[in-house]
């Protein structure tokens, strides 16, 4: 078991988007498309099967309910139901091959540090950033697109 928790979007949020076809908190229409890129799905944290799976694109504020200052952006989930990534399963295997940005925050959404990492380097960055006493949680983002992937908290 990892010394941290991987926090994907909630099943309730994903179901609301699938049912309403709207972005939570914004009401923007969710867009359905055949996957043209790898992803990942923000619920199961698996890469999409390009040209095979359908996905929903919608606006998400990853700080909603957690911090007051919003930072909305585009994210994807599978159009069909999938299982939420287990919080205690460690770093999502599909994302280990991605170029990622790991942002370290203190409460109040104060950015303390940020590391941009290549394939296979994410777990080291997570360990280094969580070892800092001034860091409360991490956000993992796709470096190329800048999109939010998931949050990491200490276990």
Protein language model features and the residues they cover:
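Polar/acidic, low-complexity leader/linker segments enriched in S/T/G and N/D
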Residues: 1-11
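N-terminal, charged amphipathic alpha-helical interaction modules
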Residues: 9-91, 100
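A contiguous, low-structure linker/loop signature
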Residues: 94-95
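Short, hydrophobic/π-rich interface segment
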Residues: 101-137, 141, 154
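Short Gly/Ser/Thr- and Asp/Glu-enriched loop/turn motifs at secondary-structure junctions
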Residues: 143-147
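C-terminal edge-of-domain segments
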Residues: 148-155
